[in-house]
């Protein structure tokens, strides 16, 4: 229901009308650190004999990648169209306020994404969590570390974020 949030679709497509589970830290960001993503694996062969690599291969054969891809702390609901347009672009601050989606305050420009202020803390903490739980996978670049630290400070944890973490801990078994 777009009227409840002021969202205006950029295109009239099916994804604008559905909610998808989005990786805050895109699978691509950590996926490229796995050989199954970059070069493939002997088990990654289609029925026609053609080899494949990338996310599909890493998901099929690498347990650590599967754990990272399914980590519930990194999954958040998003409007499907925004999720698709966001792609695997990095988070940043984009100068100006060109709102392409009505009142939905997200900006996507030049292969970069600026989330609304109210969720920047959750995004920063998600990146920090993934970076600490899965070290050595390039989750946070040196360039972005200070931005995420600032986002963490300017948008503190709220009660819903704590409740969400408790629920995930019960299901997934680890604490954030």
State what each model feature region is.
Residues 1-12, 176:
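N-terminal module-boundary/linker segments of secreted carbohydrate-active enzymes
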Residues 12-176:
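Domain-level detector of nuclease and nuclease-like folds
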């Amino acid at each position: 229901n777009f009227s409840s949030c002021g969202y205006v679709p950029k295109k009239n497509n099916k994804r604008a009308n559905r909610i998808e589970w989005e990786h805050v830290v895109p699978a691509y960001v950590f996926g490229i650190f796995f050989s199954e993503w970059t070069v493939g694996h002997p088990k990654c062969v289609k029925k026609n004999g053609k080899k494949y690599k990338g996310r599909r291969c890493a998901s099929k054969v690498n347990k650590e990648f599967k754990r990272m891809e399914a980590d519930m702390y990194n999954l958040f609901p998003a409007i499907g169209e925004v999720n698709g347009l966001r792609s695997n672009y990095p988070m940043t601050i984009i100068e100006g306020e060109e709102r392409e989606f009505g009142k939905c305050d997200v900006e996507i420009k030049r292969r970069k994404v600026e989330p609304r202020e109210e969720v920047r803390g959750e995004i920063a903490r998600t990146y920090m969590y993934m970076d600490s739980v899965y070290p050595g996978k390039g989750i946070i670049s040196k360039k972005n570390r200070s931005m995420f630290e600032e986002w963490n400070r300017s948008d503190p944890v709220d009660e819903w974020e704590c409740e969400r973490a408790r629920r995930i801990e019960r299901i997934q078994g680890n604490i954030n």
